[in-house]
Amino acid sequence: KDGYIIEHRGCKYSCFFGTNSWCNTECTLKKGSSGYCAWPACWCYGLPDNVKIFDSNNLKC
């Protein structure tokens, strides 16, 4: 699945322009195929179904 990865509180991983390699690393550490900085947060491709991603219906941050 594709989406914004979240940290333990349910907030998106924040990023800034130019941090594509950092986001890609974070995404691949979560077993995704790749990722990039879709400012203001990291967007990942190919994540396993068990990885939690941002849900706009559950705004905690």
From Swiss-Prot:
Record InterPro entries: LCN-type_CS_alpha_beta_dom, Scorpion_toxin-like, Scorpion_toxin-like_sf, Scorpion_toxinL, Scorpion_toxinL/defensin
Domain LCN-type CS-alpha/beta: 1-61
One GO cellular component term: extracellular region
Keyword field: Antibiotic, Antimicrobial, Disulfide bond, Ion channel impairing toxin, Neurotoxin, Secreted, Toxin, Voltage-gated sodium channel impairing toxin
Subcellular location, record wording: Secreted
GO biological process, one term: defense response to bacterium
GO molecular-function terms, A-Z: sodium channel inhibitor activity; toxin activity
Tissues in which the UniProt entry reports expression: Expressed by the venom gland.
Cystine residue pairs: C11-C61, C15-C37, C23-C42, C27-C44
Pfam families: Toxin_3
Domain notes: Has the structural arrangement of an alpha-helix connected to antiparallel beta-sheets by disulfide bonds (CS-alpha/beta).
Family stated for the protein in its record: Belongs to the long (4 C-C) scorpion toxin superfamily. Sodium channel inhibitor family. Beta subfamily.
Its job: Shows antibacterial activity against both Gram-positive bacteria (B.subtilis, M.luteus, E.faecalis) and Gram-negative bacteria (P.aeruginosa, Y.enterocolitica, A.calcoaceticus). Modifies membrane sodium permeability on Y.enterocolitica. Is toxic to cockroaches and crabs, but is not toxic to mice. Does not induce haemolysis in human erythrocytes. Acts by inhibiting the sodium (Nav) currents.
Protein known as: Bactridin-1
Source organism: Tityus discrepans
Classification of source organism: Eukaryota, Metazoa, Ecdysozoa, Arthropoda, Chelicerata
